[in-house]
């Protein structure tokens, strides 16, 4: 019986008696000491890993239940031995070894081998000569770090984390930026209240504060890089007749520091928005082309990952983000919401209030198709052609609802076939002189068949008409016969039926 053991240093195969696993209680007692383990198990062969990269490749294959080339070559060396039993710790690995050609082993990988492997791992340094416990611990630690790094690097869900965190931070920055900008306006408004109505843009407001300082310096300051000429002239004239209070230099320093914070946050927000756009274009290009990077990122963040969102049906994508309204409507038995986060897409915004629900439903359907291409396609889809085509289809649907002109669909490039077949694959009838006559005769036969069918049909109709006419004539004759019989009876009595009725009434 051979026992396959995977270590951080390499593959080890131990040889033991076949009856070892049957005496489980005795096995546990014997494996308590290194001497007992050495008496039971003998090292048959040991394949050492050449480097850390080699160890990582082999251990990654073991985790997936695959047989590496090093392990396969090691097992081939056991094919000449008389023993046909191989003990393996992982059942998946045992099934993979069974499928290898040329190896005929009876694989044992049930719960009975757990005590055996527990004893081997405990006395591994004594069973393998030249392997110190400190070296084995260092190898195990390094290999575990490499394996964890490898799993994190190739995890498909970790890529979506960047989008989820970026869109969450972008929303937080918008709130902070709006709060700081309003605080600057309120604070500096005590000194120059007219400036808030003249300058509407928050960033321009903060830049003017940094450039001007006190409002008394407004006439001396050049705002050509910040404001247009008309607004600059209005601002300077308003500064001369302002009704604001006076502030100290210390107050102004704090206001300027807050204005610096607003400008820094705005700069970082623009950088983060560009990062999110590039990341969405790389991960979900078709969804980005259809609904935009912000709406697409919010949909992915709400679902948790791109794969989770791709598994959702179109009806769920349509109302994603409106769960509270949906459950409230179901509870109160009112109409359910027509859209959720997808409402903020530009295509839904272009539609009027009557058609927003229809466009949201169509857009959710196309978004579901684009998502599945982005998440599951093996081909390179970074160009986003499917998303652009779906966007044109949704726009055409919107134009058809609102009576606009339809847009032409993009034509996909025609791919030439890899194999071009020249020549004829069957007999060519074009070179046959008899073909034309045969075709004409065939056409004549078909025409004759059609004419005969028409004749039969017309004859059946005539027969049916004849029978119906005979019935009508017979009914008319019967009616005439009844009338004549009734008249003859009346003439014999000498009174009409009306007179008979009157006479009966008079007698009564």
UniProtKB/Swiss-Prot annotation:
**Localization in the cell:** Nucleus, Nucleolus
Q: Which SMART domains match?
A: NOSIC (SM00931)
**Which terms under GO biological process does the entry name?**
snoRNA guided rRNA 2'-O-methylation
Question: Which residue windows are transmembrane per the record?
Answer: none
Biased composition range(s): Basic residues? 473-486, 498-508
Is Cell inner membrane found in the keyword set?
A: no
InterPro entries per record: Nop56/Nop58, NOP58/56_N, Nop_C, Nop_dom, Nop_dom_sf, NOSIC
Q: Region (Disordered) spans which residues?
A: 426-508
Pfam families xrefs:
Nop, NOP5NT
The answer to whether UniProt assigns keyword Transcription regulation to this entry is no
Query: What ranges does the record list as Basic and acidic residues composition bias?
Result: 460-472
GO MF, one example:
snoRNA binding
Ranges for domain Nop: 283-403
Provide ranges: composition bias, Acidic residues.
440-449
Q: Which residues carry this modification: Phosphoserine?
A: 33, 441
Q: Which GO terms describe its cellular component?
A: box C/D methylation guide snoRNP complex; nucleolus; nucleus; small-subunit processome
Recite the UniProt keywords alphabetically.
Answer: Nucleus, Phosphoprotein, Ribonucleoprotein, Ribosome biogenesis, rRNA processing
PANTHER family per the UniProt record, alphabetical:
NUCLEOLAR PROTEIN 5 NUCLEOLAR PROTEIN NOP5 NOP58, NUCLEOLAR PROTEIN 58
> In which family does this protein belong, per the annotation?
Belongs to the NOP5/NOP56 family.
The protein, known as: Nucleolar protein 58
What species is this protein from?
Answer: Schizosaccharomyces pombe (strain 972 / ATCC 24843) (Fission yeast)
At the highest ranks, the source species' classification is: Eukaryota, Fungi, Dikarya, Ascomycota, Taphrinomycotina
């Amino acid at each position: 019986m051979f026992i396959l053991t995977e270590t951080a240093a390499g593959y080890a195969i131990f040889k033991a008696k076949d009856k070892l696993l049957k005496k489980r209680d005795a096995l546990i007692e014997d494996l308590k000491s290194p001497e007992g383990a050495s008496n039971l198990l003998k090292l048959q062969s040991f394949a050492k890993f050449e480097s850390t990269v080699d160890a990582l490749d082999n251990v990654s294959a073991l985790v997936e239940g695959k047989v590496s080339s090093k392990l396969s070559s090691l097992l081939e060396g056991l094919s000449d031995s008389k023993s046909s039993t191989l003990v393996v710790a992982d059942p998946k690995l045992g099934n993979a070894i069974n499928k290898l050609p040329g190896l005929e082993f009876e694989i044992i990988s049930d719960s009975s081998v757990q005590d055996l492997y527990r004893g081997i791992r405990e006395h591994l340094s004594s069973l393998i000569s030249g392997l110190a416990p400190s070296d084995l611990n260092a190898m195990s630690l390094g290999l575990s770090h490499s394996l964890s790094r490898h799993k994190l690097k190739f995890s498909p869900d970790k890529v979506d984390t960047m989008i989820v965190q970026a869109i969450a931070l972008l929303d937080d920055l918008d709130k902070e930026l709006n709060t700081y900008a309003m605080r600057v306006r309120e604070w500096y408004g005590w000194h120059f209240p007219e400036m808030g109505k003249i300058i509407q843009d928050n960033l321009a407001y903060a830049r003017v504060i940094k450039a001007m300082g006190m409002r008394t310096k407004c006439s001396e300051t050049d705002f050509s890089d910040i404001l247009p000429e008309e607004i600059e002239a209005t601002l300077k004239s308003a500064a001369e007749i302002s009704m604001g209070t006076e502030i100290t230099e210390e107050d102004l320093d704090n206001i300027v520091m807050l204005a610096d914070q607003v400008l820094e946050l705005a700069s970082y927000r623009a950088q983060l928005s560009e990062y999110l756009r590039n990341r969405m274009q790389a991960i979900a290009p078709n969804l980005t082309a259809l609904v935009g990077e912000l709406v697409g990122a919010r949909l992915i963040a709400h679902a948790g990952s791109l794969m989770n969102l791709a598994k959702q049906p179109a009806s769920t994508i349509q109302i994603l983000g409106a769960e509270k309204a949906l459950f409230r409507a179901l509870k109160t038995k009112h109409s359910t919401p027509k859209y959720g986060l997808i409402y903020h897409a530009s295509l839904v915004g272009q539609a009027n209030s009557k058609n927003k629900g229809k466009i949201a439903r169509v857009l959710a359907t196309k978004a579901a198709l684009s998502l599945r291409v982005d998440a599951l396609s093996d081909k390179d889809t970074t160009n986003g052609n499917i998303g652009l085509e779906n966007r044109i289809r949704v726009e055409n649907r919107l134009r058809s609802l609102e009576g606009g002109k339809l847009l032409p669909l993009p034509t996909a490039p025609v791919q030439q076939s890899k194999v071009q077949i020249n020549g004829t694959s069957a007999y060519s009838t074009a070179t046959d002189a008899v073909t034309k006559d045969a075709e004409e005769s065939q056409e004549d036969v078909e025409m004759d068949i059609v004419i005969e069918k028409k004749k039969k049909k017309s004859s059946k109709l005539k027969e049916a008409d004849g029978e119906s006419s005979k019935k009508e004539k017979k009914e008319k004759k019967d009616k005439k016969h009844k009338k004549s019989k009734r008249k003859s009876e009346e003439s014999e009595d000498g009174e009409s039926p009306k007179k008979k009725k009157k006479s009966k009434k008079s007698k009564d």
